From Swiss-Prot:
The keyword Lipid metabolism does not apply. SUPFAM superfamilies: Homeodomain-like. Residues 203-262 bind DNA. Pfam families: Homeodomain. This is Homeobox protein HMX1. DNA-binding protein that binds to the 5'-CAAG-3' core sequence. May function as a transcriptional repressor. Seems to act as a transcriptional antagonist of NKX2-5. May play an important role in the development of craniofacial structures such as the eye and ear. Residues 29-203 are annotated as: Disordered. InterPro entries: HD, HD_metazoa, HMX_Homeobox_TF, Homeobox_CS, Homeodomain-like_sf. Residues 61-70 have a biased composition (Basic residues). One of its GO terms (molecular function) is DNA binding. Residues 166-175 have a biased composition (Low complexity). One of its GO terms (biological process) is regulation of transcription by RNA polymerase II.
Amino acid sequence: MPDELTEPGRATPARASSFLIENLLAAEAKGAGRATQGDGSREDEEEDDDDPEDEDAEQARRRRLQRRRQLLAGTGPGGEARARALLGPGALGLGPRPPPGPGPPFALGCGGAARWYPRAHGGYGGGLSPDTSDRDSPETGEEMGRAEGAWPRGPGPGAVQREAAELAARGPAAGTEEASELAEVPAAAGETRGGVGVGGGRKKKTRTVFSRSQVFQLESTFDLKRYLSSAERAGLAASLQLTETQVKIWFQNRRNKWKRQLAAELEAASLSPPGAQRLVRVPVLYHESPPAAAAAGPPATLPFPLAPAAPAPPPPLLGFSGALAYPLAAFPAAASVPFLRAQMPGLV
């Protein structure tokens, strides 16, 4: 009778062992305990009765147990293929692992477990358990990114040396060329943003500065005529040594200013109280006695006293043929100097 197969002492399963491996090991331990009890009872029975059928059944059971151990250890004929088919490729580190998927480093089905515990070594019974360093400290994101090729690598020392050699070959003019290129980039970016650059923005239009004589001549012409024809504008521009566009713009600005002044005066007149703007002439109640009456003697006394004579009103600024007089402030349009001046015909 062959010697019974005894299992060596099993160590505590590693923390990195998968749930499936732990279940298989637990089932194996239970089967081994039952096999040991069955072997003792069968030995007693074999001592009493040597039955060849019981011996064949025991050998078949032992062969099944051996195949299970080989399956867990990944040894024996077809053991690796069966382990891969049962536990998935790369789960036990049997052979090369498949490339990780595009998912996050710890997602299931994307090689996360293989990247978490990439290295394994042989343990009890030819089994596999993760390395202690891998079990205690997972890989950092940088190492996983390098393994997957997701992060670009920086330039090595060779690239720096090549760039230094190129700059040395180009000479001192290389620095000025690079500076000019860098200066052109913000300028081009400013032009693309609607012509607003970083330095000064849009081009500011130059403002024409008129001399005192030119302003006096322009003001005099404006007092006579608000709008100029093309011939008058050309003659005035030639006499003042200005362009027709400059004369035209000056007249436009001057007309706008004149309109604003008129609007302000009308608004001030509408806000002032109307009683202060109207003056009424009071008729004289009595006249002085003529010289003949004065020589005859004083007039007879009246039974009632006469009211004192009202003071004479101030002379009106602008008189009319009626009994009423109004001050000039009642007519703000007439108060302006240009209104009093004669207007030339031909207004546009």
